[in-house]
């Protein structure tokens, strides 16, 4: 890619495995700068190292969606890597325990609400100014099991 093309920057949560990992790899291999985010440092280390070795731009920055009190700071750290974000992909979620509604425990329900609803909403708000300035996009990925 040449000229004045500005490589788009994508922050993706839940990028350790599955859909998030595949999306992140595909974006990096297609010229995006990708911030892979898992719950803790080194969750995405192997993927990022392989992409960088192959000549793509990828970094890791942990964002623990279940810890709302540190979410803003973790998001700011991720954004500081390349200074902004163009695409936010909210992919991280919890789906356990998978049980009938009458058997679910309060702490499990609270965690699901915190990780699957509150954290993605807060991430959008923390990235909003950058997304607005860059005419960015938000993609929310949900499974029926996380609802």
Where are these regions (language model features)?
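Conserved NAD(P)H cofactor-binding loop of Rossmann-fold oxidoreductase domains
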Residues: 91-97
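Substrate-binding pocket helix/loop in short-chain dehydrogenase/reductase
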Residues: 99-101, 105-110
């Amino acid at each position: 890619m040449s000229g004045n093309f500005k490589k788009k920057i994508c922050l993706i949560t839940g990028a350790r495995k599955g859909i998030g990992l595949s999306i992140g790899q595909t974006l990096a291999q297609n010229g995006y700068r990708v911030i892979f985010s898992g719950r803790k440092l080194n969750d995405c280390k192997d993927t990022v190292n392989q992409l960088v070795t192959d000549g793509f731009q990828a970094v890791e920055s942990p964002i623990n969606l279940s810890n709302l009190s540190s979410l803003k700071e973790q998001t700011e750290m991720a954004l500081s890597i390349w200074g902004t974000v163009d695409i936010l992909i909210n992919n991280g979620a919890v789906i356990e325990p998978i049980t009938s509604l009458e058997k679910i425990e309060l702490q499990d329900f609270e965690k699901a609400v915190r990780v699957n609803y509150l954290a993605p909403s807060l991430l959008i708000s923390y990235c909003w100014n950058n997304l607005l300035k860059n005419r960015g996009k938000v993609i929310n990925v949900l499974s029926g099991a996380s609802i």
